[in-house]
Amino acid sequence: MYKVFVNENVIILTDEIPFGSKINLFDLKKISLIDIISNVKKHNKIFLYHKNFEKLISCFKKKIKVIGAGGGIVKNNLNETLFIYRRKKWDLPKGKIDKGETIDQTALREVKEETGIVDLRIVDFKMKTYHIFK
């Protein structure tokens, strides 16, 4: 399962149909990106389903322009998490991959640029996320 964020709303790409709750399920082959975004804004959460997860991801990526980015969850020795305030929202430091960079290099550079912290190290990979921007 992958989650794709559209502001506070989420598109869930899955190869399993979730049971037990009312869901908004759409066939990715039959819906445009504009309709997907319109529906997720209306319902706050939608599911895009295909029995073959790799085909689902491939089909979804054909509908959008994928831009690689990296960032990090920064914690101090008190286990407090660092957030930055940008575009009128609290967020984690992150940004686009520069040509020739690895995802780790991007994460370290972006966190340093956005927070000023220089003594950084990557401890663990947490997750891959996708976001849709205008």
Language-model-derived ranges and their functions:
Residues 1-10:
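Short, hydrophobic/proline-enriched secondary-structure or compact coil segments at domain edges
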Residues 12-13, 83:
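A sequence-level detector of short linear motifs
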Residues 22-26, 75-112, 117:
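Conserved Nudix-box catalytic region and its N-terminal flanking loop in Nudix hydrolases
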